[in-house]
Amino acid sequence: MSKAVVVFSGGQDSTTCLIQALTQFDEVHAITFDYGQRHNEEIEVAKALASQLRIASHKVMDVSLLNELAISALTRDDIPVSHELMENGLPNTFVPGRNILFLTLAGIYAYQLGANSVITGVCETDFSGYPDCRDQFVRAMETALCLGMDKQINLLTPLMWLNKAETWALADKYHSLTLVKELTLTCYNGIIGQGCGDCPACHLRQKGLDDYLNHKPSVMASLEQKTHGKSA
């Protein structure tokens, strides 16, 4: 029996990954991390979607220690989300160490479940400048997990080379465009669905949706080319 663990935030990307995983694996589990993020609605959205999609299990893990260590606009209510980069060239929504911690814990959870695959929705094509969304980082983490636990743990990144329009196309391919559009939470200001329309996450999400809806045939063709027409 094939098993997978999806790192699941309830946002567009991880929800699309979860929907795809349900077509690829016999047993799909999700893990959501409560790190004291700016909006707790994210946790509730993830719970609701996990229930609606009828996955094998959904674990919510308290990692509030990350909030103590990582100062970011996503972990502090008194730091407004900025469209400008910080002095180090990163957006102020970057949470240092977040994906290092998330992938490590998801790998440990997969080990306990007897799962060989951990799926994460990080993307290098349309990424927001986060260094822990790069393929190079994910491959390094995969090597570390395999060596550290003496077990093959595959870190799968279905969206890594897709742009946001192609990610919308992927959701549509699995007949879930409306679900992802209306029920997921990507907005940095905690507004479900279309979001606030002003934060960087909303801009990227809406631009991708507009691009997909205005150029459906070409975007779907591009998606198929990148995925070689496979569902896996």
Curated annotation (Swiss-Prot):
Catalysed reactions, semicolon-separated: 7-carboxy-7-deazaguanine + NH4(+) + ATP = 7-cyano-7-deazaguanine + ADP + phosphate + H2O + H(+)
Gene Ontology MF terms in the entry: ATP binding; ligase activity, forming carbon-nitrogen bonds; zinc ion binding
Pfam families given in the database record: QueC
Binding residue positions for ATP: 8-18
EC number: 6.3.4.20
Binding note for cofactor: Binds 1 zinc ion per subunit.
PANTHER family for the chain: 7-CYANO-7-DEAZAGUANINE SYNTHASE (PTHR42914:SF1)
UniProt similarity note: Belongs to the QueC family.
Protein name per its UniProtKB record: 7-cyano-7-deazaguanine synthase
Species this chain originates from: Shewanella denitrificans (strain OS217 / ATCC BAA-1090 / DSM 15013)
Gene expressing this chain: queC
